Amino acid sequence: MVNDPPVPALLWAQEVGHVLAGRARRLMLQFGVLFCTILLLLWVSVFLYGSFYYSYMPTVSHLSPVHFHYRTDCDSSTASLCSFPVANVSLAKSGRDRVLMYGQPYRVTLELELPESPVNQDLGMFLVTVSCYTRGGRIISTSSRSVMLHYRSQLLQVLDTLLFSSLLLFGFAEQKQLLEVELYSDYRENSYVPTTGAIIEIHSKRIQMYGAYLRIHAHFTGLRYLLYNFPMTCAFVGVASNFTFLSVIVLFSYMQWVWGAVWPRHRFSLQVNIRQRDNSHHGAPRRISRHQPGQESTQQSDVTEDGESPEDPSGTEGQLSEEEKPEKRPLNGEEEQEPEASDGSWEDAALLTEANPPTSASASALAPETLGSLRQRPTCSSS
């Protein structure tokens, strides 16, 4: 029909469509690989930061209940106990992981819940002792602190009871005091003698208590202080640093593997070729010229422009480039043995052997024609 497009235009459109489709697929594949690589690097960065945080940051706070025990084999008619209350607290998580980290200062406190009973108010001051021990039960540290209830007058107690009477009736409040006894203000773990437990003893046989807890709180300084007080900022900086470092490594590896633009290898291969050429010069067999029958063999020596014969022809030829080397043609009936070069880009010329110098009789018998037939090998001066 008249309105139909020409066939070459359709073919051109199909080819352009195939080319564009191929480029689109290639571009999508490249974007997919790039997205997966970035996602993998991000995951590795988060994993590295999490591993560092878990291994570097110790336990911030550890709270362990303290269960006191005492002897009961004495006379029960008295109101006092048979012995001082004693408790043994283990400083290990699940019996394996230690709570304390080497070199980290800790604040160790004992929290006592004491009722405001007349017995406790009449106690006055009493002593609390803690003894830390290591493996085998050996004591490595001991500390003692004195404690007493806070004083409250009779009028203050009556007003407090009237004010919180409704809460006291329904059990939402209690008439008790929570005493916090600081046993260690700066306790540091010894790496050679680790602490495995603590023995707590209250030096009072008439004390009454609801419960007790041993709290260990880490006192951070330096980098640990920043990681604990600014966790989100430190996490962002740490993950970004890891991601940047890994991205640079992957980028340089890709450039070296695909392009080879960072560390080109042609210089190294050039040095290897030069060394192989020098070795071939020293180890190549020398050329032996042979003349036709009826002609006497003569010695061909390299003559420089100054008229001096060089001792090492290979050193002179090594300074010539491929364009400056003269083209050599063999004599009539001459058989040449040219060694193959170690690299195709370098062509080494064979060297002539130095024959023994002729005697005076043979030198005088040489005809002018023979001397004229000798062709000297042109070489460039080393200067």
UniProtKB/Swiss-Prot annotation:
Tissues expressing this chain: Expressed in the paraventricular nucleus of the hypothalamus (PVN) and brainstem dorsal vagal complex (DVC) in oxytocin and catecholaminergic neurons (at protein level). Highest expression detected in subcutaneous and epididymal white adipose tissue, brown adipose tissue and testis. Also expressed in brain, skeletal muscle and adrenal gland, with lower levels detected in liver, heart, kidney, spleen, lung and small intestine.
Cellular-component GO terms for this entry: cytosol; endoplasmic reticulum; endoplasmic reticulum membrane; lipid droplet
Protein name, as recorded: Seipin
Organism: Mus musculus (Mouse)
Biased composition (Basic and acidic residues): 322-332
Traits of the deletion mutant: Mutant mice display increased early postnatal mortality rate, reduction of total body fat mass, nearly total absence of gonadal fat and great reduction in subcutaneous fat. Mice have enlarged visceral organs, markedly steatotic liver, decreased adipocyte size and number, and display decreased levels of plasma adiponectin and leptin, glucose intolerance and insulin resistance but not hypertriglyceridemia.
Glycan-carrying positions: 88, 242
GO biological process: adipose tissue development; cytosolic lipolysis; fat cell differentiation; lipid droplet formation; lipid droplet organization; lipid storage; negative regulation of lipid catabolic process; positive regulation of cold-induced thermogenesis
Main subcellular localisation: endoplasmic reticulum
Subcellular location(s) per record: Endoplasmic reticulum membrane; Lipid droplet
Listed Low complexity bias regions: 353-371
Compositional bias annotation for Polar residues: 292-302
Binding partners and assembly: Undecamer (an oligomer having eleven subunits). Oligomerization is important for its function in lipid droplet formation. Interacts with LDAF1 to form an oligomeric complex. Interacts with RAB18. Interacts with ZFYVE1 in a RAB18-dependent manner.
Protein encoded by which gene: Bscl2
Stored PANTHER family: BERNARDINELLI-SEIP CONGENITAL LIPODYSTROPHY 2 HOMOLOG BSCL2 PROTEIN (PTHR21212), SEIPIN (PTHR21212:SF0)
Biological function: Plays a crucial role in the formation of lipid droplets (LDs) which are storage organelles at the center of lipid and energy homeostasis. In association with LDAF1, defines the sites of LD formation in the ER. Also required for growth and maturation of small nascent LDs into larger mature LDs. Mediates the formation and/or stabilization of endoplasmic reticulum-lipid droplets (ER-LD) contacts, facilitating protein and lipid delivery from the ER into growing LDs.
